[in-house]
Amino acid sequence: MPNLFVIAGPNGAGKTTYVRDFLPQEMRCREFVNADLIAAGLSPFAAEKASFEAGRIMLRRLRDLAARREDFSFETTLSGRAYAPLFRELRAAGYFIQLDFLWIPHLDITRNRVRQRVTKGGHNIPDDVQLRRFHLGVRNLAELYRPLLDHWRLFDNTGDHPHLVAQEKSGTIEIVDVPHLAIIEQSASVRFVSDSPAITAEEAPAFTPDEVTRRSLRAMRRAYARVVLENKAWGLPVIQWRDGIGVVEVPPEQLEPFARRILEVDGDPLPADEERALLSHLKI
């Protein structure tokens, strides 16, 4: 069965960074299509003006890959509804569709991350576009795309350790982090479990991640640590969210120990050879 991996989330959520670790290393998928990168190629100094043409090129490329029944992936904010017909076509053709949504709790995080990306030579997304897209993605996941997916997962990608909030596979939903899901539902004015009472934290079952989820979280940690170390090399802070505080900046001089904390798994450090390779990979 061929696979489609969709990586979704607001601008600045870390989608492309996650993809670079997750797809080739953990899922052995080499085909990745990104409309923002296409737009940047069409118009390097004003990529937003090429977004419509980039979207057309992207959809054409996706259908070409599907016609060859290849495994492939693409990135999206999921703020539009145009992918629904494509998902229906692919499921009818026998594709297994998995979507990972990387959630960000506050628009200020995305704005600051996009500004940093521009500083490092990446593409810009205008503030008004970020604002329009911010809540639409998770709302469309809950209200439009859920029944078109075989497996979706909702991750919080802002704290020291990215973690799974909820997932649904083959129609069975599993809520892993009840308080975070409640925050997401309230902020986006949406319900993922609309036909049953809200689950309390005490009622949530114990969660044991499967192998694919462990791979995803491992890739997210590696990807986040890379960004942290890249920011250190550029002399930039890391923008993140801390419960009870809000948006905070971790200054450059604190970023190497911060990267080490990210790589720890339940208090266990990354194997020494992997840590050395990661901590020494940036030469700017």
Which residue stretches match the model-derived regions?
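P-loop (Walker A) phosphate-binding loop of NTP-binding proteins
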Residues: 10
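N-terminus-biased detector of the onset of the functional/mature region
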Residues: 195-284
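Short hydrophobic/aromatic beta-strand immediately N-terminal to the Walker A/P-loop
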Residues: 5-6
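Conserved glycine(s) of the Walker
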Residues: 14
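A glycine- and Lys/Arg-enriched "phosphate-lid" helix/loop adjacent to the NTP-binding pocket
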Residues: 95-144, 195
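Conserved substrate/cofactor phosphate-moiety recognition/catalytic segment
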Residues: 17-70
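Glycine-rich phosphate-binding loop used to anchor ATP phosphates in small-molecule kinases
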Residues: 50-104, 134-137, 153
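NTP-dependent small-molecule kinase module
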Residues: 143-195
